[in-house]
């Protein structure tokens, strides 16, 4: 006869039922003699072990957390989602880094192709060079020199570009400043024409010795009629008292002389563009005119070739028209003269 093993919880229930039945029989005093003998035959360590086992099972049941299948599935989904998101982020970051490296490699390759060095080197034939020129120069040395030149150009590329930009900005600023100063100069000239300048002169000068005026006695017998007859001024009692007080004053008199300054000369006007000349003025015979006029240095030109004549000390004149030396000898050299179409078109433009 075989006995199948029982689960642990069934064994626990059987032990618990046996112990409870025994305790109830002892309390009520019932039971067979065989049972009493059997109870008395059970040793105390067994009960002790059973009680300890029961207490341990209770503590383990308190700490045990029961979870169903749904909770396990939700936890698996959360873990799987987190791992999937981390995997996607790592793949995207790797792709971005790869693209950046590819772009940098392409830019470096493009920069190297654009920074090719072409030039000429001149060497003075000194004794040291003559002694060292027989040495063999390998291709590696030349490549090293070229690489060094390219690196220097690559390092100084930004600096040279910024320097060129600064130079262009400064040049543009200078041009604008000159233009603004020219407009302000025109307005200033107009204002100066409207203003009048006065010069004050004090006489006598402070450093000169002031002569003492003779004292007039108070009992002056000169009548008001005498003043009126001598100076042509109608005298009254108030003017007579004022004259007497002024006569008693010893303060020297000073006279203010106001003399108007001459107006500023008119600004020179170019005979070619009819604008005021600010700067160097060129005075020469105007085309089709019998008197000299003023020009900008770049507006006095040859009638034929339309080149400025400001760089030449002299020029040639024919039929009241200025010519440079080359055009004059080409057209009017005395051997043959035939005005061409180019000169006719220039005259039409003039």
Swiss-Prot record:
The record's account of how the chain is modified after translation: Ubiquitinated. Ubiquitination by rnf-5 leads to dissociation from muscle dense bodies during molting and is required for ecdysis.
Coiled-coil regions, chain positions: 83-110
Skewed-composition ranges (Basic and acidic residues): 45-65
Domain named LIM zinc-binding: residues: 268-334
Domain of life: Eukaryota
Main location: cytoplasm
Pfam families (UniProt xref): LIM
Gene ablation phenotype (knockout): RNAi-mediated knockdown leads to disorganized actin-containing I band filaments, disorganized dense bodies in the muscles and reduced motility.
Alphabetical list of InterPro entries matching this protein: Znf_LIM
Keyword annotations: Cell junction, Cell membrane, Coiled coil, Cytoplasm, LIM domain, Membrane, Metal-binding, Nucleus, Ubl conjugation, Zinc
Biased composition (Polar residues): 1-37
Region (Disordered): 1-65, 177-198, 206-225, 235-262
Gene Ontology CC annotations of this record: focal adhesion; M band; nucleus; plasma membrane; striated muscle dense body
Entry comment describing in which tissues the protein is expressed: Expressed in the body wall muscles, vulval muscles and the anal muscles. Expressed in the muscle arms of the head muscle cells that form neuromuscular junctions and in the anal depressor muscle.
Membrane-topology descriptor: Peripheral membrane protein
Any one GO molecular function term: protein domain specific binding
Cellular compartments annotated: Cytoplasm; Nucleus; Cell membrane; Cytoplasm, Myofibril, Sarcomere, M line
Protein function: Required for the assembly and integrity of muscle dense bodies, which establish the adhesion sites of the muscle cells to the extracellular matrix. Decreased localization of unc-95 to dense bodies and their subsequent dissociation plays an important role in ecdysis during molting. Involved in the organization of the muscle sarcomeric structure and thereby required for locomotion.
Official protein name in the record: LIM domain-containing protein unc-95
UniProt organism field: Caenorhabditis elegans
Gene: unc-95
């Amino acid at each position: 006869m075989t006995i199948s093993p029982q689960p642990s919880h069934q064994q626990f229930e059987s032990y618990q039922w046996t112990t409870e039945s025994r305790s109830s029989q002892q309390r009520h005093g019932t039971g067979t003699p065989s049972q009493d003998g059997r109870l008395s035959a059970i040793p105390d360590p067994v009960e002790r072990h059973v009680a300890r086992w029961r207490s341990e099972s209770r503590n383990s049941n308190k700490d045990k957390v029961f979870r169903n299948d749904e909770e396990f599935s939700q936890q698996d989904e959360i873990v799987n989602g987190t791992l999937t998101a981390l995997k996607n982020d790592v793949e995207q970051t790797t792709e971005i880094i790869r693209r950046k490296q590819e772009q940098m490699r392409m830019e470096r390759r493009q920069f190297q192709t654009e920074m090719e060095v072409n030039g000429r080197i001149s060497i003075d034939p000194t004794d040291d060079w003559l002694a060292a020129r027989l040495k063999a120069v390998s291709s590696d040395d030349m490549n090293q020199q070229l690489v060094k030149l390219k690196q220097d150009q690559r390092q100084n590329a930004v600096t040279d570009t910024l320097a060129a930009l600064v130079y262009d900005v400064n040049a543009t600023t200078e041009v604008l400043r000159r233009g603004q100063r020219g407009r302000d100069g025109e307005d200033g000239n107009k204002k100066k024409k409207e203003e009048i300048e006065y010069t004050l002169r004090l006489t006598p000068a402070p450093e000169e010795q002031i002569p003492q005026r003779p004292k007039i006695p108070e009992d002056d017998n000169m009548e008001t009629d005498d003043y009126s007859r001598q100076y042509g001024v109608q005298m009254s009692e108030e003017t007579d008292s004022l004259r007497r007080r002024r006569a008693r004053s010893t303060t020297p008199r000073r006279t203010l002389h106001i003399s108007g300054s001459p107006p500023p000369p008119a600004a020179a006007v170019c005979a070619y563009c009819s604008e005021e000349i600010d700067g160097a003025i060129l005075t020469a015979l105007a085309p089709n005119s019998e008197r000299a006029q003023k020009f900008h240095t770049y507006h006095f030109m040859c009638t034929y070739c339309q080149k400025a004549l400001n760089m030449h000390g002299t020029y040639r004149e024919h039929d009241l028209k200025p010519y440079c030396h080359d055009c004059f000898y080409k057209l009017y050299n005395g051997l043959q003269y035939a005005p061409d179409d180019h000169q006719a078109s220039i005259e039409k433009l003039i």
